[in-house]
């Protein structure tokens, strides 16, 4: 069963529930207050920013204009309703109706959604990796059904721009990172093992102080939040690594909430999720270039890793990529087929990987 069919079946079940209650709760059915939450703040991060700028206003306007219903969103970003580690559980419990969560902070429960972290160096373009990964989600329905046990319906997500490395010191060869403490979040921590660095688990909300105080001397991050959070004030060097764009910020709806929404509201919501996804990736591309320029203006030294060093790192990490594919298999998911199909689709969509992994 494809992810799309899974969504349709869940929606159909929801319509039956709405029909059963419509005659007695018409006033309730006409007006919906929906709590939407993300652990990160909006402005620096496209995946959250476009909830506020695109999804919420578009759904609100269209529901009012095209249906007999109204929708009012109660927005809670930056941990005001649920923090980075609480969004999945809060959506499951119904504290949140619509949750946007980084799967990087759910390495066990949302293991499968960290697919792009497990296959670095394919492409740093979110306009390639976003559509590619969403097609993978369509072809392999376990990306949707994994949310069943958490009482949620997966409705999509947009891809980040390319990951890079900000440091407090200049460097050119990966050997220079040996033993250096570098912060990263969850599934991208192992990238540092193959660069020889000493990894430190962290999150965006604590990076500035950690860099400033010397808890670590570098951070794995894309340039837009590096500039937006002003990390360049305390770490003056940024290297474009080419680790890749990732789709790892799934948006879900609590199943009870989804069941209460009429079919015309659901239709609008799913259509506007498509618009949201494109907006996230458009913002990512735009901010990637502008953020690098802004970092230079901020006094940060910006450089590219270079194809030779990038190729060395990709080759070194290949055994780990195979290990992750095997972990999917061990959990009952077709990891080898998924990883191979991801690389195949990415190339069809325009990716030129620095190294093509052999998944055994």
Language-model segments: which ranges?
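Bacterial N-terminal signal peptides that target proteins for export
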Residues: 1-14
